[in-house]
Amino acid sequence: MRIREVNENKKQFISLLLLADEQESMVDRYLEKGTMYVLEDNDVKAECVVTDEGNGILEIKNIAVDPENQGKGYGKALIDFLASKYADEYSVLQVGTGDSPLTIPFYEKCGFVRSHKIPNFFTDNYDHPIYEGGVQLIDMIYLQRCL
C-alpha cells in the first residue's frame, strides 16, 4: 500500500471523489486549490483532497473509498497519513460532513470530535436534495482532531 500526492490531471480521479461529494461543481471549488492524495494497493482504493483553512487548520474537503473496498481500513489509513504528515504544520485536522449515520461514526472512530455546524449547508449549496443512508442531509457538521 502506498499513498502519493497528485499534482497534475486531478480530474482523472473525479469519479471516486463524486462518491463523497456528488455535485461536480462543488468538487471543482476545492479540487484545484487543494492537495490531493491517492491511496494505492495494486490500484486506487481511496483518495482525498485537503486545504489550508488558515489559523493552523487543515481541512479534509473530500475523502472517498472505492465501495468494494470500504471497511478495510483504507479511509483510516489516509486520515492517519494526513495526521502524521501535517502534525508539524497544523494544529487541527478538520472535516465537514452531513449529519449521517454512515459518516459521523467513522470520523469519531478516527479521533474526531464534533466542533460546530453550518445550518442548511446542503439545502443552500446543492441544486438537488442529498441523501445518505436514507437521511436527507441539511446541515454541515464539522468535526476536528487535534494534531
Whereabouts are the PLM-identified features?
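Conserved N-terminal entry element of GNAT/NAT acetyltransferase domains
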Residues: 1-9, 141, 147
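Acetyl-CoA-dependent GNAT
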Residues: 4-67, 79
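Short hydrophobic/aromatic beta-strand or adjacent loop that forms the aromatic wall/cage
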Residues: 34-36, 137-142
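Short glycine/proline-centered loop/turn elements that form peptide/ligand docking sites
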Residues: 65, 79, 100-103, 120-126
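Conserved acetyl-CoA pyrophosphate-binding loop and the N-cap/start of the following alpha-helix
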Residues: 69, 73-81
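Conserved GNAT acetyl-CoA-binding A-motif
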Residues: 85-99
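Conserved catalytic-core motifs of GNAT/GCN5-like acyltransferases
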Residues: 94-96, 108, 113-134
